[in-house]
């Protein structure tokens, strides 16, 4: 509404100037005279053109000054509002750039975590491959050790069969009864210990019956040489001593070989036990690693799904944000263009204002000159009263013409004012539309802020889930360590029990070895009366062996 009177006030000096020119522009003093003589003739009803023009000159000037000041204040206020909007747009753009930078940092962190997880999975796969290779090698070594043990067992069984055949041919039925429990125990003992017991029994029985031992050795060597060996011993006693020494040396060599084979078998048994334990341990670790690998693969798939979903949502958000930024940039460019137009219009209005002020000063100078001329004309009023009376009709017609001209000019000015009001209404509508667009943009910005907050909350939830998964993985590692420690303790306990069992077996073996000697000594000393006691001792030994077994 403040823009409405501005065109009329801007053009009011021109109207006063045209009216003054129409009234005072005539060079003949006869036309100017009747205008000054109008005040003393009120019955005529015509307006006086003399002093009244001073009032329409001063009042429109004051109105124009106030209107221009209000318009300038309004334009300055609009300019400040436009600057504030531009600053707000810059702040929003800066905020969006910070948001995008934060999202890039977060995505880089997530990408680094994903690469780290991939590297851990790759390392676990490599370790699994190495463990499978080691397990395969351990299995091959175990099979080779089993084959070697079977070969050594067959060889020892063959030697045991040879010595048992020699004992059967030499000792007869009584030694068979004495060595019968030894054979029963030998079925439960390793072949090396059985062979060692056979050799010791041969050595112990040799001082009592050297000829029988010689016969057994000769029978083991070959049948045709037995008769010839006996004839030679009967013929040559010194050859008997030489053969016994040679036989003793052979027995010692055989005993050494048996000791070495027993040591080798014990060592191989220990290696076999260690390999079996290592294989079981590796199989347990392999199963654990397989379970962990499956869990990691599942977690990896879940994380990949979540990452793909987040990536899609982020791409959608980036697309929407880019579209919004393009819209904001377009609105900002339009606002800049509008600001430039407003600035140009303001400069133009300032130039027009300066021109109007110059025109006003010129009109004031002209007003002062006209006042002086009016004073001169008032002096000539008395002289021109008669001429004015004669030309009153002519002046009345001239005044009617001037009135019509002024009315036509006023109609044109009113028409221009209506056009300016229409233009002002259009500009006001455009301004309201821009304000509505700005409000819509602000609502869009608030929606984006809420979406960004939701995404931040989702990222925090994902971080918490990742921390929970890491805690569960640590708990699984701790449980695996606890199980490993318990397994180590059980293996130590089993080794201790194995050592105790070996001690008990060795004691039982010594008791069994000493039992026949004690029986012989007691039979020679006390006779046949205490034979029942020896049998009871043997029964007690057998019961002890059964309990240990």
From Swiss-Prot:
InterPro entries: Myosin_tail. Residues 135-158, 165-187 have a biased composition (Basic and acidic residues). One of its GO terms (cellular component) is myosin complex. PANTHER family: COILED-COIL DOMAIN-CONTAINING PROTEIN 102A. Residues 1-61, 135-195, 207-248, 472-496, 509-549 are annotated as: Disordered. It comes from Mus musculus. Residues 37-55 have a biased composition (Pro residues). This is Coiled-coil domain-containing protein 102A. The modification Phosphoserine is found at residues 12, 26, 28, 536. Pfam families: Myosin_tail_1. Keywords: Coiled coil, Phosphoprotein. The gene is Ccdc102a. Residues 69-160, 263-398, 426-517 form a coiled coil. The keyword GTP-binding does not apply. Residues 530-549 have a biased composition (Acidic residues).
